[in-house]
Design a protein with these regions (language model features):
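Beta-sheet repeat architectures centered on beta-propellers
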Residues: 7-27, 36-39, 43-47, 58, ...
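A short, polar beta-strand/turn micro-motif
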Residues: 150-160, 441-460, 692-712
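Beta-propeller and closely related beta-pinwheel folds
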Residues: 340-368, 375-425, 429-522, 530-532, ...
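Tryptophan-centered short beta-strand motifs
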Residues: 108, 258, 264, 270, ...
């Protein structure tokens, strides 16, 4: 056998669920709480710094399920003003609430609800809400609210008003006859005097109309016109109107609700007089409405402006439209209706409502100085530079700045749920199809906007896709797991490139994922679920030509992840531990600007521990020689408690900086106990928190025939002597080894023979007990069991030294003899009858033979008695400790500075193994609060190709 060595250059390729024979060098079976970095190697993730428990403005902790199923959002005003908030669901006949906390201090913000704005928060799930933040305003959309229009005016009655306008020169009227017919009654003929003026003619006609005595009719003179209104018993009443006069019988312009053109409009009228201008009687599309604005806001001279139809809804119901959460000051917000602009011109044909009327709005977005909306298969954008204006400014002309309302026009049922900007336009996402909205000649306008489909991928409609800079990522859910895809748009005439980036971890990501976020700066995406402690990451690195790193890994946090947000190198998380909600953040750099510990070389670190925070107080108990370090949150009983002393030795002053101890908690869970130390003298430097595991499970090692490591020689004989790891800035390195067939401790039993007895001395065939000396373990998860060398899981602990098997594992039959029959059947199946035993009246007997099938025949008939025959299979039961052995790495001789922080910038550690490669599993495992940085590994061993040459 040849003595060989090979190198694995790095462990940056992350998790792969492929067989070990197909894994590339650098891929691993599992990576928990790691963070791959092309510069630093595979590092232990940063710890999360405790900011605050989430409280109300009154200082009361949120507990239990108060914030469950909430919609979380993040607001970044500037570098120093950041907030994290949530919207709770409608429950117990009460609307939801908005809660916001300062992301840097944890202070609860004051939320003011303007008017009845809180009624908008009627969503029953976090999936009902969308939050779109720009500067100091967050637009909140509830997709359970159906959009309605304001009611149409009821005071308009057609033909209940009329106008008589004298037109032309006075000479065309002097000496000519005038008459008016109102409601079927005609006035007496009137001939204007040769020297009559406009006033005289109108005054006389007004007198003649009044003489008709028509009920409810009022005549008012305005300049050169008469205005007629009819109101009977407070109700506007229609009437007919006609008139003739002048040299051609047409010196009276007569109209009621509409006029043929603008020239018919009188220069004097009453304030808010509305007339329809009918440019063409064949088409309604060119109609518009004019309203008179009197100079004195009453009647007389003034001007005409374009207006809305007198019987048309003025716009949308603001209470049903998206609302806004406005940041009005430090830690203060107001939730209010948005001042949506009303429709001020046109009607439902010439200036229609947005297409989301009668439907719901799924999402809002900003693009090119417009506010956009997604509603079913429609995309609606506001007027340019007027985000709250959803109607055209004029019904007479169309401009490029008018609102845009377009439909996807797909043959598939489509409900748009997300939108992302791309170089070519905007990418629209629905569950089964994706589209692009664009314009050929620049910005989107009502005339130039187009939509066309670009792909037909199936995706989740409850988790929005994310923009990672050069491409988009989205997920697709199956009944049992999640697939992750990358989409890179191409040119307008090309389909996007779509890659299944999650194929290598197929069935690894759980189906309950409800949050997907991205860090463009750090080139990763992250997925989490409100019901899980795990966050799944996918990180890449490209040099501009090719992708040099693709890595899947997972973090496990100290509680279920309710929310996470990424802001440059900071990651904020809200987690739920039991009944408490905590806000924490982690800095993703290994050398943060503000560090807790600095060694003599100036290297800065924050501890790799979760919920680390300054102890709220530190007291020393001189009698018992111990320090009490009080914690600022409810104690987590399932975590390892850590106390660490902060400080710096960079100035040459050596103190307790970096001192670390695994502390016990008091019975009430209010403080950690450090024995033998008086930490009250350095109370401001005492930090408390919880350890978390860095766990890198390495695949089986193979001799690689190809330089790039893609050709595993899995038929050879390879014995690994040792592994040598090159590590960067690291504290304690830990390793675990599991060897096939080697158990830390075992206890063997014959079932139905070595079992326990109850208080009355009766055998309990399901219970098996051992002594602590036989099986000593730390965690019950280490205890395993096998029956006939087959692993079983159907057992429960009755105590620390006793388990109870499930009844289904027992092969037994109880029968009754009658003193005559000798042939009996047992009801279980076995491969061999060698271990079948029989007891009669509790005494084992061999006075029988196997009669074929599942029958036995007694030589002497068993006596007549109930349940006196017991047939069973005496299986072999083994209870054992399946333990990973902790290996102590061997370090080369070196020097270190006494009393300094225990950090090495670079070293090599050796792990002795001396096992065949298929006989062991190796894990890099540590829960130390100090960093870990793994660069590469070289293994040494003996390789034999088994007498065959590889070609």
């Amino acid at each position: 056998m040849a003595a060989v060595t090979q190198r694995i250059s790095n462990y940056l390729s992350g998790v792969s669920k492929q067989a070990d024979t197909k894994k590339y060098p650098g891929q691993v079976k599992e990576c928990i709480n790691g963070l791959p970095d092309v510069t630093l190697g595979m590092t232990k993730r940063p710890g999360f710094k405790f900011i605050s428990k989430l409280k109300t403005t009154g200082g009361t902790d949120f507990t239990g399920t108060q914030l469950d199923n909430a919609k979380w959002f993040y607001i970044n005003r500037d570098v120093t003003t950041r907030y994290i908030g949530c919207i709770t669901p409608y429950a117990n006949s009460a609307n939801g609430n908005i809660y916001v906390w300062n992301a840097d201090t944890g202070a609860a913000c004051t939320i003011t609800y303007a008017g009845t704005a809180q009624n908008y928060l009627s969503g029953t799930s976090h999936t009902n809400y969308d939050v779109n933040t720009v500067q100091d305003v967050s637009i909140i959309t509830n997709d359970s609210q159906v959009i309605t229009a304001q009611p149409e005016p009821t005071d308009f009655v057609a033909q209940s008003r009329g106008t008589l306008l004298l037109s032309g020169k006075i000479e065309q009227m002097q000496g000519y006859t005038f008459s008016v017919t109102v409601a079927g009654q005609t006035t007496a003929s009137y001939t204007a005097a040769a020297n009559a003026d406009f006033d005289e003619i109108l005054n006389t006609i007004e007198t003649n109309i009044n003489a008709l005595g028509i009920s409810g009719l009022t005549v008012t003179k305005h300049g050169t016109s008469l205005q007629l209104d009819r109101v009977v018993s407070s109700t506007r009443t229609p009437f007919t109107l006609a008139a003739s006069g002048g040299d051609d019988k047409e010196r009276f312009v007569v109209f009621q609700d509409w006029a043929d053109n603008e020239s018919w409009l009188p220069p004097n009228s009453f304030h808010n007089h509305v007339v329809t201008i009918v440019n063409s009687r064949l088409y309604d599309e060119d109609n518009y409405y004019a309203k008179f604005k009197a100079d004195n806001s009453a009647a007389g001279s003034g001007y005409w402006i374009e207006t809305i139809g007198p019987n048309k809804s003025p716009g949308l119901t603001k209470a049903k439209m998206p609302h806004r959460l406005r940041n009005t000051g430090t830690n203060t917000f107001t939730f209010e209706e948005i001042p949506w602009g009303d429709r001020i011109v046109g009607d439902d044909l010439t200036n229609s409502h947005p297409s989301f009327l009668g439907k719901t709005i799924k999402k809002t977005f900003f693009h090119d100085d417009r506010l956009g909306f997604l509603s079913e298969d429609n995309v609606i954008l506001s007027r340019a530079k007027n985000p709250y204006e959803l109607y055209a400014v004029s019904a007479r002309t169309h401009t490029a700045g008018d609102p845009i309302d377009v439909n996807c026009a797909s043959v598939r049922p489509t409900k748009l749920h997300a939108i992302k900007p791309a170089r070519q336009g905007l990418i629209l996402f629905s569950k089964n199809q994706q589209f692009i909205i664009y314009a050929d000649d620049g910005p989107l306008t009502p005339q130039s906007t187009k939509i066309r489909p670009v792909s037909n991928m199936e995706m989740s409609d409850t988790v929005d896709p994310i923009d990672i800079g050069t491409h988009f990522n989205f997920i697709s859910k199956t009944p049992n797991f999640v697939r992750v895809f990358a989409m890179q748009p191409k040119g307008l005439g090309e389909s996007p490139e779509i890659l299944d980036i999650g194929r290598v971890v197929n069935e690894w990501i759980t189906v309950d994922v409800d949050t997907l976020v991205a860090s463009i700066q750090n080139e990763f995406i992250a997925m989490s679920s409100q019901s899980s402690k795990d966050i799944y990451f996918y990180r890449t690195y490209s040099d501009g030509k090719e992708t040099l790193m693709e890595s899947w890994f997972k973090w496990s946090l100290p509680g279920t992840v309710q929310s996470m947000a990424l802001d440059q190198d900071d990651m904020y998380c809200v987690t739920k531990q039991g009944n408490q909600y905590t806000l924490a953040n982690a800095n993703l750099t290994q050398s943060p600007e503000v560090a807790i510990i600095t060694n003599a070389l100036g290297q800065k670190i924050n501890p790799c521990m979760d919920l680390y925070a300054q102890a709220t107080s530190v007291t020393y108990d001189a009698v018992n020689d111990l320090s009490k370090c009080y914690i600022p949150y409810a104690h987590l009983a399932d975590k390892k408690n850590i106390v660490i002393v902060a400080g710096t030795t960079a100035a040459g002053t050596f103190n307790n900086s970096g001192y670390t101890v695994n502390a016990e908690a008091d019975a009430g869970g209010t403080y950690f106990i450090v024995n033998g130390q008086n930490l009250s003298t350095v109370a401001s430097n005492v930090y408390v928190g919880y350890a978390f595991d860095f766990d890198l499970q390495l695949p089986q090692l193979y001799y690689n025939l190809a330089k790039e490591g893609s050709q595993h020689d899995y038929t050879s004989n390879l014995t690994i002597a040792r592994c040598k790891f090159d590590v960067g800035l690291s504290g304690v390195m830990g390793f675990k080894l599991n060897v096939t067939g080697r158990f830390a401790a075992t206890k063997s039993y014959k079932m139905f023979k070595n079992n326990c007895r109850d208080a009355n001395g009766v055998e309990v065939y399901t219970d098996y007990e051992w002594s602590e000396a036989d099986l000593k373990y730390i965690d019950r998860n280490q205890v395993k069991a096998k029956i006939n060398n087959k692993l079983i899981t159907d057992f429960t602990f009755q105590s620390d030294t006793k388990i109870r098997l499930g009844n289904s594992l027992l092969k037994q039959t109880t029968l009754s003899g009658n003193g005559t029959d000798t042939l009996f059947a047992y009801t279980f199946d076995v491969q061999s009858t060698d271990n079948i035993k029989v007891k009669i009246d509790g005494i084992e007997t061999t006075d029988f033979v196997f009669a074929g099938g599942n029958f036995i025949s007694f030589n002497t008939a068993p006596p007549n008695a109930a349940n006196n025959i017991f047939i069973y299979n005496e299986d072999d039961l083994v209870i054992y400790i399946d333990e990973w052995y902790f290996l102590e790495p061997i370090s080369d001789a070196n020097t270190y500075l006494a009393d300094d922080v225990p950090l090495d910038e670079s070293r090599t550690v050796t792990i002795p193994i001396h096992q065949r490669s298929e006989n062991f599993n190796l894990r890099i495992f540590t829960d130390s609060p100090f960093p870990v940085s793994l660069n590469s590994m070289m293994w040494e061993g003996n390789y034999s190709p088994r007498f065959y040459k590889r070609t």
